[in-house]
Design a protein with these regions (language model features):
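Short coil loop/turn residues that delineate tetratricopeptide repeat
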Residues: 23-25, 60
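Alpha-helical adaptor scaffolds
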Residues: 1-16, 23
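Short coil/turn linking the two alpha-helices of tandem helical-hairpin repeats
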Residues: 1-5, 34-43, 81-88
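TPR/TPR-like (Sel1-like) alpha-helical repeat modules
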Residues: 10-12, 45-61
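Alpha-solenoid helical repeat scaffolds
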Residues: 27-32, 64-67
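Conserved structural position within tetratricopeptide repeats
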Residues: 16-20, 56, 63
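Terminal, low-structured helical/coil segments at or just beyond the last alpha-helical repeat
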Residues: 60-88
Length: 88
């Protein structure tokens, strides 16, 4: 969070640049974006939407990264269940 010295907009750009490299097919990047960025800016809807998109995308969207994508989906499912812990 900004109040603790972070820069959410710089983080957003970094996440977006990283996701653009694989056209969003490397799901771990999107999962981490959802988990860290949207918590930092206190955006519950963005958090829920982004993690659900990770879950809804087929893991084989990037065949060479299927295992990483499956792990991203497992994490996204867990993080969705934790939403009430992070947002009021």
């Amino acid at each position: 969070p900004k109040q603790l010295g972070g820069d959410p907009e710089a983080a957003k750009k970094g996440f977006e640049d990283g996701m653009a490299v694989t056209d969003g097919r490397y799901l771990m990047g999107k999962a981490l974006y959802g988990y860290y960025y949207f918590r930092a800016i206190d955006d519950r809807e963005g958090y829920l939407r982004t993690l659900q998109e990770v879950i809804d995308t087929p893991a084989n969207v990037m065949p060479g990264q299927r295992l990483a994508n499956e792990l991203a989906q497992i994490r996204a499912k867990r993080w969705l269940t934790e939403a009430d812990d992070y947002f009021e």
